[in-house]
A protein has these predicted regions:
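The structured alpha-helical core of multi-pass membrane proteins
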Residues: 1-638
């Protein structure tokens, strides 16, 4: 339970810092109908979006215990509607964009509380310093401080509930906001309902984390914890509303979150708010690493260098992403400078994430046998609700919403180009029946006149089938330079829907000569082919299926194992080989995006000292015509 509070609820738990302030910022008046309506919008947004959609429905759509929009897509990627991947790309792109704005707004709002103590305190430099420290410590892992997050967030939520309850006593009538009538009345009668609804939506921006962190905490822990968290949040929102109605003349000029704090707790609350903002930022950063790791294994994103700073399962650190996020957060801070301006940039991207999740959930429920009518009711209802939220947040586009939408758009386009280019490359891999080459491979092994290339020669076969082989792979063994070896190993990598799967099967195709190994890897598992192959070989040796002792007498007498060499076939696209401008543009962008990627041997976890990369042309379309022979004219008289 405590761990769940620290991991899952950091983002949604810091929303009281800025939601009511944002509502006061966009509202034209401060009176009872507006405040009760706004509070009712908050309460029922939390109920419909977080409780019903995510806690009651989405948490049941688990992929072997894992959650999140990419885990959900992994369950659906074999769906007959092949365009479903676009929903996952859009949802992932907007979720990653939200991960850049969240640390900026939460930490800034927390530090702005110091202005009530010292109005001339430089908020921006302090915020930049805290953000810098948060991103710097990622490289060392957060195992030690992460253990204290749960207890800290428990204290934070108790503080929210306690001060909210104390403030609620001053205007108990505010509890009427629990009735959805006041939200509906605001939407029907208030000219600024659109802006108020866009601000109220910020209360649920952390709801996606409940689903994304399903694998870390479990459905039961999240469900039980949410009952406590939601109660504390509602008490705090009601307390802020009560204070606003009692101080309507000055409410718009202060942050009601800090205004309801007893004077003796003000400094303590600022410290707690800053700590909660750091916890929320940490959760978003770690979540970004996890999302991109999944995207890499789903072939949505280029392979990047991943580090494991601690022994905790699932704790990742991606240096390039950490630096990119840090630069993005700093630019957001320098561009908007204070939380009031950041509120306009916040919420738009995550609305799109939720809308994409709704559509994917609809396909999932239908796939699981839920009736078509119920699926249509669920998807239709939430498309209407989230469509209204999206329209409300689009009203903030020019004021700052363009920023996160631009980030999300760039990320979506990068992923789309990567996916489309990868598919085209796979489509142009020519495969041949492997059985046609059994005899010639055996003959090469037996031909002493061919210099031995390696004791064990390993290829990664990209056809995806054990019965077929990439023609360029065969060309490498037979034609390019005949490669004699004692054993030939063909590795087939199969990425499966189950997140933590790691298993293999091995077939002996030619006795004591040719072996095919299929490795089934879950989308949360980092591929480390060298390590996995070593385990496979050890199993085969123990079973007596292969003898790996060196063939050289001077080494064999001491039981020294033969060497391994890996051959990687790398296809290179040359734009001048094609007149197709569409292919040229797509593959040029693919090559540009690929510059942030590590090379294939490192991506597969191979020992680069024993890897040879052979480059071959990737031909997508051929130029028409042929070389014309010129016959020289014979001298006269001949």
């Amino acid at each position: 339970m405590l761990v769940t509070l620290g991991i899952v609820f950091g983002d949604i738990g810091t929303s009281p810092l800025y939601v009511m302030k944002a509502i006061l910022h966009v509202g034209q008046r401060v009176d009872e109908p507006m405040i009760l309506g706004a509070l009712s919008c908050i309460i029922w947004t939390l109920t419909l979006q977080t409780t019903v959609k995510y806690v009651l429905v989405a948490l049941r759509a688990d992929n072997h215990g894992e959650g999140g929009i990419l885990a959900l897509y992994a369950l659906l990627r074999r769906h007959k509607r092949k365009w479903i991947y676009l929903l996952a790309l859009m949802g992932a792109g907007t979720l990653l964009a939200d991960g850049i704005i969240t640390p900026a707004i939460t930490v800034t709002t927390a530090i702005e509380g110091l202005e009530s103590v010292s109005p001339h305190l430089p908020v921006l430099p302090i915020t930049l310093a805290i953000i810098t420290v948060v991103f710097f410590v990622q490289r060392f892992g957060t195992e030690s401080i992460g253990k204290s997050f749960g207890g800290f967030m428990l204290l934070w939520f108790l503080l929210l509930g306690a001060v909210g309850t104390i403030s609620l006593v001053s205007y108990p009538q505010v509890i009427r906001a629990l009735n959805p009538y006041y939200a509906l009345r605001l939407l029907a009668t208030s000219p600024e309902w659109f802006l108020v609804l866009g601000a109220a939506f910020l209360c649920t921006t952390g709801a996606e984390a409940l689903y994304s962190d399903l694998g870390h905490c479990g459905r039961r822990n999240i469900t039980v914890s949410w009952a406590f968290v939601k109660t504390m949040l509602i008490l705090n929102y009601l307390g802020q509303g009560a204070w606003i109605l009692c101080h309507a003349d000055v409410a718009a000029s202060v942050n009601p979150f800090y205004a309801i704090m007893p004077q003796g707790l003000l400094i303590f609350s600022i410290v707690m708010a800053t700590g909660a903002a750091i916890v929320a930022s940490q959760a978003l950063i770690s979540g970004t690493f996890s999302i991109l790791s999944e995207a890499m294994n789903l072939d949505f994103w280029p392979r990047m260098r991943i580090k494991h700073p601690t022994h905790v399962k699932g704790q990742l650190f991606i240096p390039a992403v950490n630096m990119a996020m840090y630069i993005g957060v700093v630019l957001i801070l320098l561009l908007f400078r204070d939380s009031s301006h950041m509120e306009a940039a916040y919420g738009l991207a995550i609305t799109i994430t939720m809308l994409m999740a709704t559509l994917l959930l609809g396909f999932y429920l239908r796939q699981r046998g839920v009736s078509r009518i119920l699926c249509m009711v669920f998807v239709g209802s939430y498309c209407v609700i989230e469509g209204i939220f999206l329209a409300a947040n689009l009203s903030k586009f020019l004021a700052g919403g363009w920023c996160t939408l631009l980030i999300a758009g760039v990320l979506f386009c990068m992923m789309l180009v990567w996916v489309r280019a990868k598919r085209i490359r796979r489509q142009h891999i020519s495969s041949k029946p492997l059985s046609d080459y059994y005899q010639i491979i055996s003959d090469i092994k037996a031909d002493d006149r061919i210099p031995k290339y390696a004791s064990n020669l390993v290829y990664v076969n990209h056809t995806g089938k054990e019965s077929t082989v990439d023609d360029k792979l065969i060309y490498s063994i037979i034609n390019k330079q005949p490669k004699r070896a004692d054993h030939y190993w063909l590795i087939n990598l199969e990425y499966v829907d189950a997140p933590d799967t790691l298993e293999y099967s091995c077939s002996t195709l030619v006795e004591d000569t040719l072996y095919s190994v299929t490795m089934r890897i879950g989308f949360r598992i980092e591929p480390r082919v060298s390590l996995y192959l070593r385990q496979v070989v050890e199993d085969l040796v123990a079973e007596g299926r292969v003898d790996l002792t060196s063939c050289y007498p001077s080494l064999r007498r001491y039981g020294v194992a033969g060497d391994f060499r890996f051959i990687i076939i790398h296809r290179v696209y040359y734009p001048e080989d094609s007149f197709d401008r569409r292919y040229n543009l797509l593959m040029s962008l693919y090559a540009l995006i690929g510059k942030i990627s590590i090379d294939e041997p490192k991506a597969l976890g191979l020992d680069t000292s024993v890897v040879v990369v052979e480059r071959v042309p990737l031909i997508l379309s051929r130029r028409e015509g042929h070389v014309r022979r010129i016959v020289p004219a014979l001298p006269e008289g001949e």
